[in-house]
Amino acid sequence: MTMVHSLTINQLIEKLRGGELTSRQIMEACLNRIDSVDGKLNAFISYDVEDALAQADIADKARSEGQEGPLLGVPVAIKDVIAVRNHPLNCASKILGNYQSPYDATVIKKLREAGAIIFGRVNMDEFAMGSSTENSAFGPSRNPWDIDYTPGGSS
């Protein structure tokens, strides 16, 4: 079986277009990987399994009907400072509580237009004021190559 987490985005797109993988298979692999490593890394603040799989199924149906898009069916996690309509927007802070964004940021609109699956929010420094996630209300993230180190700064 293909180790989805080790593929580049171009390789994922090639396998999707070639029918070697479905969006659902990729999404399931991503969710399984998150479940297996995020306890150590603390990279994700939140993600919605049901919504992610539903989006993957929609992408697979679209592809089966001949639709295409540059990112159709590719999972994308979003930094917790970018607005996604009807999803929590914390900016890695407890101060915003359960705030739900009433709109999509322009980058989210563009990703959706390209067919991307927006499925999770990733950790960062509170209000993007730092470079190590040590100041996140959700705890620090860890470097996936060596968990004794910070994963580094911002985008």
Question: Where do the language-model regions lie?
Answer:
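Long amphipathic alpha-helix in the N-terminal Rossmann-like dinucleotide-binding domain
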Residues: 50-57, 115-116, 125
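Immediate post-signal peptide segment of exported/extracytoplasmic ligand-binding proteins
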Residues: 59-75
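An N-terminal boundary/leader segment
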Residues: 1-48, 53
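Short glycine/serine-rich loop/turn segments
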Residues: 72-155
